[in-house]
């Protein structure tokens, strides 16, 4: 019997590899950027170097010395910060038709050979956004400066609160990958352009219910000096994380849905506030009149605080389990 046209078609067509673009924001990276570019593998289709008004002429150095046809250099007239440079690269990558966009720093601390591992969960439809995690391997922490370990522990906890990704660590890690559909849905014009960039992206992804996955990695530390001043960024990060916590809780539990967790939060806060206000009032009264508060007064102040704290603990328990599990980009 002669085969029909349908018989000639493959039963299990091979899925084409996604077009991957790498964005490398640069500021004072002339010492390392050429080595980083040389180590980017063949799986990457385009490489976008963004010169963020570098005083050392990183962009010019790449143009003059890198012959890789995949490399394109964009230049800022003024410094916009790591976030601003990255988003310039993101926009250009989308214009080029990239399906997955990787952010890779130009300081040599990240191994470009790990790009396939970073991209794999997104290409397989298991995640919308992936990021490196330098804390996954305990022995590797010995090579991390102590100030970075301490700072990352604090920033990771704040990021968990503001983003809702309780299973994600190392939020300031700049080795990331994102699906282009998710990237198009992000309000890039609202995202912080400076050092808060990565944490702000996680917050925006949390509002979208995008799936974020950590990828274990090792960072290489040389003699480069970090541009981040911990004493300077801590107050800024505290304020921005606090605002993002308020926005996330309001949108997640009072706009997008309203359930038992929302009630637990509202009632728990009311009970706590009432108990504290009532207790403070009678404590002040007893100090002025020198008359001890009665047992009933103490119980009436303590009981709402106890009940309120239990309700708030129940809300936090629900929130920590309310981490997105279903990737969003296949639905867009």
Question: Where do the PLM segments sit?
Answer:
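A conserved acidic beta->alpha catalytic loop
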Residues: 51-60, 78, 108
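Short, well-formed alpha-helical segments that are part of the catalytic scaffolds
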Residues: 27-43
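Acceptor/aglycone-binding surface of glycosyltransferases and processive sugar-polymer synthases
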Residues: 72-95, 100, 112-195, 221-232
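Short beta-strand/loop segment that forms part of the nucleotide-sugar
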Residues: 37, 45-54, 74-75
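Acidic helix N-cap motif at the loop->helix transition within catalytic regions
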Residues: 31-35, 56-65
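Cell-envelope/extracellular polymer assembly enzymes that use nucleotide-activated donors
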Residues: 19-21, 46, 200
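Hydrophobic helical membrane-anchoring modules
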Residues: 2-15, 190-192, 196-332
């Amino acid at each position: 019997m002669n085969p029909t046209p349908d018989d000639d078609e493959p039963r299990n067509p091979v899925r084409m590899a996604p077009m991957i673009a790498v964005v490398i924001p640069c500021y004072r990276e002339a010492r390392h950027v050429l080595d980083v570019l040389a180590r980017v593998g063949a799986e990457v289709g385009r490489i976008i170097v963004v010169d963020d008004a570098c005083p050392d002429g990183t962009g010019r150095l790449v143009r003059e010395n890198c012959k890789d046809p995949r490399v394109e250099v964009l230049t800022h007239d003024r410094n916009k910060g790591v976030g601003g440079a990255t988003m310039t690269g993101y926009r250009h990558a989308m214009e080029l038709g990239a399906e997955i966009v990787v952010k890779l720093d130009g300081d040599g601390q990240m191994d470009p050979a790990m790009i396939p591992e970073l991209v794999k969960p997104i290409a397989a439809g298991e995640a919308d956004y992936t990021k490196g995690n330098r804390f996954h391997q305990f022995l590797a922490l010995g090579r991390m400066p102590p100030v970075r370990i301490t700072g990352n522990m604090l920033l990771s906890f704040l990021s968990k609160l503001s983003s809702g990704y309780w299973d994600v660590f190392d939020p300031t890690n700049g080795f990331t990958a994102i699906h282009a559909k998710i990237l198009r849905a992000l309000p890039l014009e609202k995202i912080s352009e400076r050092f808060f960039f990565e944490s702000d992206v996680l917050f925006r992804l949390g509002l979208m219910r995008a799936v974020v996955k950590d990828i274990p990695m090792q960072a290489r530390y040389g003699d480069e000096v970090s541009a981040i001043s911990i004493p300077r960024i801590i107050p800024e990060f505290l304020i921005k994380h606090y605002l993002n916590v308020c926005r996330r809780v309001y949108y997640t539990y009072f706009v997008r849905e309203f359930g038992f967790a929302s009630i637990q939060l509202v009632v728990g806060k009311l009970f706590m506030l009432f108990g504290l206000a009532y207790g403070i009032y009678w404590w002040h009264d007893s100090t002025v009149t020198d008359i001890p508060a009665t047992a009933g007064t103490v119980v009436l102040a303590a009981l709402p605080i106890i009940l309120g704290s239990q309700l708030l603990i129940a809300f936090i328990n629900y929130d920590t389990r309310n981490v997105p599990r279903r990737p969003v980009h296949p639905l867009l």
